[in-house]
Amino acid sequence: MVTVEEVRRAQRAKGPATIMAIGTATPSNCVDQSTYPDYYFRITNSEHMTELKEKFKRMCDKSMINKRYMHLTEEILKENPNICEYMAPSLDARQDIVVVEVPKLGKEAAQKAIKEWGQPKSKITHVVFCTTSGVDMPGADYQLTKLLGLRPSVKRLMMYQQGCFAGGTVIRLAKDLAENNKGARVLVVCSEITAVTFRGPSDTHLDSMVGQALFGDRAAAMIIGSDPLPEVERPLFELVSAAQTLLPDSEGAIDGHLREVGLTFHLLKDVPGLISKNIEKSLIEAFQPLGISDWNSIFWIAHPGGPAILDQVELKLSLKPEKLRATRQVLSDYGNMSSACVLFILDEMRKASSKEGLSTTGEGLDWGVLFGFGPGLTVETVVLHSVST
């Protein structure tokens, strides 16, 4: 008779989890950041708030964002005027949009990831779906399973209302699933639509306007699994370790509350300062076992919560400007996409590395770090190992 230990050994994968494919998707509606303040104040019937509009213009100018993509068009907003007010009851209208559109956008990204992976979708064993855009039962994970035609026995995990750190969370969870279930192939999807957070301006709550200047809509998907099949599956990055921590003295720094008026965000403390002050501790804990202490010797994927966070992290750690190049590029091209951001940066980095003829998917370097930052303040730290291009 076999022992429990023998059963456990047979259930576990031999090698580390790897990212095998990445896919992304975007709504068709593209918004130019330079003209967005005029549009935003017009569509929310707030053009009389001239001083506030000038403040918002300065926010957009300093955002380092060139363009964003949004599901909410002028037509949709005119049909739902309560969404355009600052604090009008509007949750039903918002839910009607995101419950349908979040899984649909996720499906687009997932199909691209599955195509790159090259295996039949019947080989997907697990689905991890993450969104901060709305809540429903059965969830977006169920809707995605139906939209893709996955097996009814696929094991699903739905993560709602996590916020901007959750791109790191889904990678950490998928790593554990892949390494502890031999042959597992985990479809990870992050899909975010700002229909839950869009609202008109308020001169008493400027932190709400920060979000209006930064957030954009997109979805990203990955296939994660261990022990890739030779000649069939090609890993892009290996997942070496993953950790989560709460930063000291940061309670209330970022809050989000789902109310009748939608999802409201509040920035209550110096978020860039809190992150930059504490980030090196997470780096030391993650890289000391590898004998790495030079933060310029690794590649970087950091959630671009905003330019101030990136600037202060860069300054605190004396990072060379090119270290956050991929992160800044994604911020410029898409804005802050909450949980989907770090997946987009991974995609940007591996594509740029190949295009530039660099030796690895990590800008020619072997080791790298992925950071997710969000409400809590919560920090996700993932150590990555690149592969040859």
Curated annotation (Swiss-Prot):
Protein name: Chalcone synthase 2
Keywords: Acyltransferase, Flavonoid biosynthesis, Transferase
Entry keyword Nucleotide-binding: no
Family: Belongs to the thiolase-like superfamily. Chalcone/stilbene synthases family.
Pathways per UniProt: Secondary metabolite biosynthesis; flavonoid biosynthesis
Swiss-Prot/TrEMBL catalytic activity: (E)-4-coumaroyl-CoA + 3 malonyl-CoA + 3 H(+) = 2',4,4',6'-tetrahydroxychalcone + 3 CO2 + 4 CoA
Function as written in the Swiss-Prot or TrEMBL entry: The primary product of this enzyme is 4,2',4',6'-tetrahydroxychalcone (also termed naringenin-chalcone or chalcone) which can under specific conditions spontaneously isomerize into naringenin.
Source species: Solanum lycopersicum
Pfam families on file: Chal_sti_synt_C (PF02797), Chal_sti_synt_N (PF00195)
Alphabetized GO MF terms: acyltransferase activity, transferring groups other than amino-acyl groups; naringenin-chalcone synthase activity
Annotated active site: 164
Lineage of the organism: Eukaryota, Viridiplantae, Streptophyta, Embryophyta, Tracheophyta
PANTHER family, per database record: CHALCONE SYNTHASE 2, HYDROXYMETHYLGLUTARYL-COA SYNTHASE
InterPro entries: Chalcone/stilbene_synt_C, Chalcone/stilbene_synt_N, Chalcone/stilbene_synthase_AS, Polyketide_synthase_type-III, Thiolase-like
GO biological process: flavonoid biosynthetic process; polyketide biosynthetic process
EC number annotated for this UniProt entry: 2.3.1.74
